[in-house]
Amino acid sequence: SEGTVNAFRIQGLKLQDYVNAMVKNRPIESLRKPFAVVATQLETGQRTVFTRGNTGQAVRASSSVPGVFEPVRIGRFNYVDGGIVSPVPVDAARQLGADLVIAVDISSKVTGKAPEGMLGIVNQSIMIMGQKLGEQELARADVVIRPRVNAIGPAEFEQKNQAILEGEKAALAALPQIRARIGQLQKVRMAVPV
């Protein structure tokens, strides 16, 4: 209904305003650290990496899950969730110049059970597609952190504290691997003549 669409529009604008307030209305290119936002161009399906422009608007576009939030119009195009074409944007991080890419895999895994009904089949198919895309990107990361959040659905906001706790546990468990990788990078840098 029209009321539902307006509610989603308001939620999206609230996110945009919140992000812009957090960055003091600085555009992406003026942020202190290199930053990029990945979104999907709805008309073409192309991955778009925003490295300039309105920070809040780009984050809103990247967060616009189809069917949950309306697409965000930027310039001539409409944008939706970047996870559709790039679930784990390792390549975007590399393009920014990252020497070490630490990825976090929170993708849903296929359960091994046959889905029920047409909607179940569609959902399972989308999950498989996202999982395969994500695996390709995760393979290009230096370290992958995998919090145990598979039992928590993407819309189960009441379990956010549990999800955060699982993320913290997984990050702490990955620290030795991260430190080892940093050590390897430092050795390579020292060995390269200037």
Q: What do these predicted regions represent?
A:
Residues 1-194:
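Patatin-like phospholipase
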